[in-house]
């Protein structure tokens, strides 16, 4: 069974390969009458676009998006382009492929990549840039995420790179306003300067390094999530784990919660305004029992160092002969950098899906009643 789609009511299907003519997605289930312009999607794609600094791949892709269906504009809409409730198809052309860079690994498996497992499963693989397993596929996710954000009124989703290899930010210097001021999406201005020096050395060595990304959603109402097998945190974890190179996900304090006592980990409550409680902490990351609590939803995921490096590594050929692999081509020394907008997009898609599912089950009722 193929699994190129995710979501229930807000459903996203992506298509395309790294070196194919194009990639894209189909978003089905977007409500009608939502204003949507290509420029809004393009703004998100530009944040992920390669070749914008020396710290990312130098593959030059404009990532220009085309909306092929699902929108309409005429004098009755005041000239505004609105969603129609039908599937929204988006396409992004590939224009800077260099397939010849991969000719040497046509019959050899790259260690740490999906070369062997794809061929073991399908009996065939597209060796040009990794084909479907390439992080290039995530451009389509970011495009879908831009639409998902439009479904979530009042919700703000932001991401940041909070750790580069073993080098974590200083939480005392965390500033969302800094994220757009450096090429790392780093919220710590001091750490960003240090990371530039570290990554320059990594690049000079022809190696790579991992990272930790944090994504926070604020303004999420309480009540989203479908226990017990459609918990909000379970779906978020699955969405983040589906991103290329992600090897771990945590919600709230995550694994650090295992080091706490019960009284330390409890998110105590006091009476708040409007009949809703006021929380005194957010160790749970905004999700309790698989349902959003109204607090900020906090998710972190770990990205491994890419295996596309210049260091010679032992491997085997398709006919099981010993081989040595040196990966050529243009690659990110830290794939975690451009994973930040991808993580935001996946958060948006999951929340949009759960928002529509919640509305379909319980309607538009307020989660709390006064009096």
From Swiss-Prot:
Q: Mind telling me which Pfam families this protein's record contains?
A: Chorismate_synt
InterPro entries, from UniProt?
Chorismate_synth, Chorismate_synth_AroC_sf, Chorismate_synthase_CS
Q: Which reaction does it catalyse?
A: 5-O-(1-carboxyvinyl)-3-phosphoshikimate = chorismate + phosphate
Which coenzyme or cofactor does it need?
FMNH2
Instruction: Establish whether keyword Lyase is in the entry.
Output: yes
* Keyword terms of this UniProt record: Amino-acid biosynthesis, Aromatic amino acid biosynthesis, FAD, Flavoprotein, FMN, Lyase, NADP
Annotated binding of NADP(+), by residue: 48, 54
Q: Name one GO biological process term.
A: amino acid biosynthetic process
Quaternary form? Answer: Homotetramer.
Q: Which family does it belong to?
A: Belongs to the chorismate synthase family.
The record describes the protein's role as: This reaction introduces a second double bond into the aromatic ring system.
In Swiss-Prot or TrEMBL terms, this protein is called Chorismate synthase
Gene symbol here is: aroC
